[in-house]
Curated annotation (Swiss-Prot):
Its main location: cytoplasm. It catalyses: L-homoserine + ATP = O-phospho-L-homoserine + ADP + H(+). This is Homoserine kinase. GO terms for molecular function: ATP binding; homoserine kinase activity. The lineage of its organism: Bacteria, Bacillati, Bacillota, Bacilli, Bacillales. Catalyzes the ATP-dependent phosphorylation of L-homoserine to L-homoserine phosphate. One of its GO terms (cellular component) is cytoplasm. Keywords: Amino-acid biosynthesis, ATP-binding, Cytoplasm, Kinase, Nucleotide-binding, Threonine biosynthesis, Transferase. It comes from Bacillus subtilis (strain 168).
Amino acid sequence: MNEADMLFSVTVPGSTANLGPGFDSVGMALSRYLKLTVFESDKWSFEAETETVAGIPAGTDNLIYQVAKRTADLYGKEMPPVHVKVWSDIPLARGLGSSAAAIVAAIELADELCGLKLSEADKLHLASLEEGHPDNAGASLVGGLVIGLHEDDETQMIRVPNADIDVVVVIPFYEVLTRDARDVLPKEFPYADAVKASAVSNILIAAIMSKDWPLVGKIMKKDMFHQPYRAMLVPELSKVEHVAEMKGAYGTALSGAGPTILVMTEKGKGEELKEQLALHFPHCEVDALTVPKEGSIIERNPLYQVKSV
């Protein structure tokens, strides 16, 4: 594959979801990325460029192809075959939005190959239909911090563009599949608990919109929707929470379904907190991340544009 054959690239950030009580609604982009580099070809194929995605299906059984094809089919279009190089540092099944990033990238892929000219709202709704909720997908699509509601016929989203914080993630070296994490959740919620849980979630949203990050951190651990049930799957959660609190962090939450644990701290203090947490959790990967203001980015090859005129 040479430069002249490259059509375009798609770069999509990973994400965290929930921030505690913002269950299936609140998402935040993180500075881990998935990148697709797309080349002209006579057949569909996928090539892994990083260890993170080693072993992904190389043909049309790849998730990215399947989502892209469903998107094209919805608009009555047929995609031309391409070769796709896949680069990613978003670990799979760790609660950092790897599947949502792949879905957003796939929709962007179909949009570019078929000239669909999808709006941001179109892309959000299509991605949310695939995911079942808009938190991770919305954050990967537009960047920043998002609050969303997905219904079959419509997806609503509010974007908070400047999350002026640092984030440290503690990533255990085991997977928690989303379906397993959902299996531990209760099938029903007592009315009184639902009322209290809703109030907690309301305060989280108000604190986010006010950019009162210390309050956001305090409220994250008051979640009643999922963390009390999923904590058994991630034994590091309470320990990270304790150490982070001792080091002055704003707060701690499961990232999505876990097992990654997200710690929110003051802007400029992420690297220092990363070093401190790494000392306490040597059996985990610990990384300092930022909240990118941009979501998915398309970069087109000018050589291809000239050739296509």
